[in-house]
Amino acid sequence: MQIFVKTLTGKTITLEVESSDTIDNVKSKIQDKEGIPPDQQRLIFAGKQLEDGRTLSDYNIQKESTLHLVLRLRGGMQIFVKTLTGKTITLEVESSDTIDNVKSKIQDKEGIPPDQQRLIFAGKQLEDGRTLSDYNIQKESTLHLVLRLRGGMQIFVKTLTGKTITLEVESSDTIDNVKSKIQDKEGIPPDQQRLIFAGKQLEDGRTLSDYNIQKESTLHLVLRLRGGMQIFVKTLTGKTITLEVESSDTIDNVKSKIQDKEGIPPDQQRLIFAGKQLEDGRTLSDYNIQKESTLHLVLRLRGGMQIFVKTLTGKTITLEVESSDTIDNVKSKIQDKEGIPPDQQRLIFAGKQLEDGRTLSDYNIQKESTLHLVLRLRGGLF
């Protein structure tokens, strides 16, 4: 049959061939006609470079098909790619080829998608945008092909606008890495991104596997409000923790962030600011906590609990106590909060007046119990 070969100069050569001819044979015919040595010829059909040992029929090249002839640049050379199975692949490359290009050639030969390929040379992983000459890879150099771990997976990121972004990640990727990928796709700077999974805000230095984020998990992307800020939390040991917060965060949220960083359960944390213990349901803005404010973290003892004390005026006082505290101790705490001397206080629980030397546990007073405070009259003789 006849086929046509078109050169970059626009000249078209007509060749007589058989469908069983190899690409080698075709190159020899071109040499006979045009004097171009086979090793300087690259033949392209349907966007693919044709390999010497294959036949025209392998590529489904039929009568009157047109091949394109490209002359090799001087940097044209062969390199080898060795897989973990021990197989060696031979590639025709230019020293100006990028690692991307090389991965595409491997895909053409072996069917392995580029995003599953890692190429190693001289102990270094090769970056997609760099060229072979950047790494001083010369003719007959051997690269090593490692397939990405199975941890390679897709996850989804849903924005507040309802848009869903698909990301290719590894389970070993850090949250930082994920934010960079989102920046690449969407242009949102990492420091404006908050990623939420299973109700938790994800911390930059942690990995997807730390949060048990698996393939096809969906993260939620929230853009930081302008109220996004850093605050400091100082522990009794003198250690200072830095937290990323919003002024709309509740004290609960802040305790969860401390748990994520330090492993301390929220119910063992007491947070103090400006001499006040902070209540879980309130927000940072409720307490006028601003950027770079310092909170103090005090750990609750095991028996630590909150109880309430209701006065005759209807006011309710919240106290932090231990079940081993005596009634005396409780009266001292009330004095600290309200300025009422202990000898003017009578405490009632379950209809009983409580005696100073007894403990809360003696009266079976448990967390969130409510005591009633009655003030003694001055002339009273109890």
Curated annotation (Swiss-Prot):
Protein name per UniProt: Polyubiquitin
Family statement: Belongs to the ubiquitin family.
Protein species of origin: Schizosaccharomyces pombe (strain 972 / ATCC 24843)
A GO term for molecular function: protein tag activity
Chain's role: Ubiquitin exists either covalently attached to another protein, or free (unanchored). When covalently bound, it is conjugated to target proteins via an isopeptide bond either as a monomer (monoubiquitin), a polymer linked via different Lys residues of the ubiquitin (polyubiquitin chains) or a linear polymer linked via the initiator Met of the ubiquitin (linear polyubiquitin chains).
Taxonomic superkingdom: Eukaryota
Cellular component aspect of the GO annotation: cytoplasm; nucleus
Primary location group: cytoplasm
Positions of the pro-segment in this chain: 381-382
Cross-link Glycyl lysine isopeptide (Gly-Lys) (interchain with K-? in acceptor proteins) placement: 76
Gene Ontology terms describing biological process: meiotic cell cycle; modification-dependent protein catabolic process; nuclear mRNA surveillance of meiosis-specific transcripts; proteasome-mediated ubiquitin-dependent protein catabolic process; protein ubiquitination
Gene3D superfamilies noted in UniProt: Phosphatidylinositol 3-kinase Catalytic Subunit, Chain A, domain 1 (3.10.20.90)
UniProt keywords, alphabetically: Cytoplasm, Isopeptide bond, Nucleus, Repeat, Ubl conjugation
SMART domains in the cross-refs: UBQ
